[in-house]
Amino acid sequence: VKSYVTSKQLKVKLKFEPDDFMIEADAAKLKQILYNLLSNAVKFTGTGGQIEIYVYKREDVAEFIVRDNGIGIAEQDQKKVFVEFEQVDSSYTREYEGTGLGLPLVKKMVEMHGGYVYLKSALGEGTEVIFLIPLQQGMKKQ
């Protein structure tokens, strides 16, 4: 991902607040969730764009936000992106390759941690994916 960020001259902003709290989570799965979301943000953000990653402690949950100022997703297509093998098929996204598994996988891994994921987006205005994971809840077996 780093090479794509560099080649597209993207600005990446990171913020952790506070910067010293712990989350009981599967580290590999949490890393995969963030990798998938960051990869999508990079893929759908144009040269010179911006990506922001925020992590907040909210009472008993950790809130993660991955925001970009890329192409965005039309309202009628937003539910599709969390369904396996579904992809938004429009002139905006046709040039981008993918399997349609990234966000469904994110959803499944977040839910395994007892959390949930949703997004806010509009065409031409970028996308914000938010997921919340309980700070001290065991993973659900699948």
Tell me the role of every PLM-derived stretch:
Residues 3, 71-72:
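Glycine-rich G1-box
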Residues 114-115:
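Conserved glycine-rich
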Residues 6, 11-21:
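Conserved catalytic submotifs in the C-terminal HATPase_c
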Residues 48-60:
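Short beta-strand/loop element within the Bergerat-fold HATPase_c
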Residues 97, 102, 106:
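Short alpha-helical Gxxx[C/S/T] motif in the catalytic ATP-binding
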Residues 72-80:
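Short helix N-cap motif at coil->helix boundaries in the Bergerat
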Residues 41-42:
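Short helix-loop "hinge" at the ATP-lid/N-box region of the Bergerat-fold HATPase_c
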